[in-house]
């Protein structure tokens, strides 16, 4: 399955967007899911017939369900009940089992996922605190940005933030180059956790899940 190498599209004179919707699962989450599964398989952490479980607001669930179907793994997705029906249908289409928790309760989804994995011996993708998530974006997303900009000066990199994998990986890349590129994380105003506020319900699915441990911009 071909993931990544998405185009950098010119939006205005000095503004570009990376078109991650062209990934097979329709989002940037295809990158860390493929990367983590590749490493797990390489290191013997996975075998055919294993069950992989993850808590997600949807995009990672779609990516994981799709790749589990391709690779011969069973898949369980734990998610808040208020996530879009389209996401649920996509996950179901790929044959994954969906377990719902109360709307907006992302911490509850993560806790249930961990408990189920421990009780039944499921393999956790563990996107929220898996260093492979960050490593993936350092080794793929960041490198693609460099190649597409011909190593020219990048004034700022802006990304919506859920797990923090994208922005942390790209940040580490620019730090290695010792550039003064500004790294800007975007979160919903209704759930300004990174800004020191309280989590709340909002309408932007996929970012701003509200768990304070998901993002560490000091790394």
Residue ranges of model-derived segments:
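PLP-dependent amino-acid enzyme catalytic core
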Residues: 1-219
């Amino acid at each position: 399955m071909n993931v990544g190498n998405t185009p950098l599209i010119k939006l205005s004179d000095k503004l570009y967007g990376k078109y991650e919707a062209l990934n097979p699962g329709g989002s940037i989450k295809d990158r860390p899911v493929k990367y983590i599964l590749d490493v797990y398989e390489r290191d013997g952490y996975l075998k055919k017939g294993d069950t992989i479980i993850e808590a997600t607001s949807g995009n990672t669930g779609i990516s994981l369900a799709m790749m589990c179907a391709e690779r011969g793994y069973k898949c369980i997705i734990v998610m808040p009940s208020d996530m879009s029906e389209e996401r649920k249908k996509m996950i179901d289409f790929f044959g994954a089992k969906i377990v719902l928790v109360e709307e907006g309760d992302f911490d509850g989804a993560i806790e249930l996922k961990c408990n189920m994995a421990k009780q039944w011996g499921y393999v956790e993708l563990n996107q929220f605190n898996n260093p492979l998530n960050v490593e993936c974006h350092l080794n793929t997303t960041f490198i693609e940005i460099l190649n597409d900009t011909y190593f020219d000066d990048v004034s700022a990199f802006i990304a919506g933030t859920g797990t923090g994998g994208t922005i942390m990986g790209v940040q580490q890349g620019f730090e290695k180059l010792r550039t003064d590129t500004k790294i800007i994380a975007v979160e919903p105003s209704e759930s300004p956790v990174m800004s020191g506020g309280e989590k709340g319900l909002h309408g932007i699915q996929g970012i701003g899940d509200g768990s304070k441990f998901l993002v560490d911009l000091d790394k």
